[in-house]
Amino acid sequence: VRARWAVRALLAGVLALAVLSGCAQSVDPIERLGKKAAQKVRASHEPHRGKYRRWGLAAPLAPAPRPVRSPDYGEDPAGAGLPPVLDHVPTRDKVVFLTYGADAERDPRFIDMVRELRLPVSVFLADRAVGPGYARAARLRAAGAGIENLTVGHTELRGLSYAEQRAEICGQQERLRSRLGLHPRLLRPPYGAYDRTTLQAAADCGMAALILWRRMPGRDPESYERGGPLHPGDILRPHVQPREEESRPSVPLTTETARLLRRIQASGLTVARLEDYL
């Protein structure tokens, strides 16, 4: 009998300890789920940690400061009420701006790069060059890219009539509105070519500015300047030329962008969103 009571007492003690330990169970994921599971939980809150190395960067991009006031563009040489034409933003902030055209859709990894690095890029789209149903444009937007106007047909505007230029600019505004629900405020004239009629048509279509890019005399006008130092406020256009008779570029856009990002970091600069400064 005594042995039976001793067994019962021992079982009761074990049960009491189990209840107490259950009530005092820690909510720390390291104790509750185990160290390996807890590391997975914590990692999910830092999805972009270390991704910069995947894209060939030694360190993540520094966060861009928020502009405290709108830049002063000075006198409007084109006339009152017409949008300014910019190849740089007058700012002392240590930032530059990355802008792209249709080549942003040609490199399938570019969308991943924008999302993982949280690149504040601006992509100018022409209806002629956009993929079916604007699907990739929608993915670019979801990844964080700003979507702006590059006209309907990517046609050189300079020399066209007012009606023709307005149709190109306003027509693409309508397409971006109907397909993506957007109302872009920035226009990039194809090939950087424009005239006073372009400015008037752009103003009538609701454009706030015409955006060019930093050039270098004697170099490829479609490319950003490769030599010389970068300056705060530079508007850059990473660009790669497709191989002859091929739709894919000879150098992936992600490779060219990573090369430029390393140069930006080496210059003590970072990338800011162009729309935040305009």
Regions found by a protein language model. Name each.
Residues 96-99, 121-125, 146-149, 185-188, ...:
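Structural recognition of the beta-strand scaffold that forms the well-ordered cores
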Residues 60-156, 175:
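Active-site beta->alpha N-cap acidic-glycine motif
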Residues 1-10:
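Bacterial N-terminal signal peptides that target proteins for export
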Residues 19-22:
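C-terminal motif of bacterial Sec signal peptides marking the signal peptidase cleavage site
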Residues 115-116, 120, 146, 162-195, ...:
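CE4/NodB-like, metal-dependent polysaccharide N-deacetylase domain
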Residues 81-91, 130-131, 251-278:
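C-terminal domain-boundary segment and adjacent tail
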Residues 24-26:
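Bacterial signal peptide processing site
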Residues 193, 198-232, 269-278:
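His/Asp/Glu-enriched short active-site or ligand-binding loop at hydrolase and phosphoryl-transfer sites
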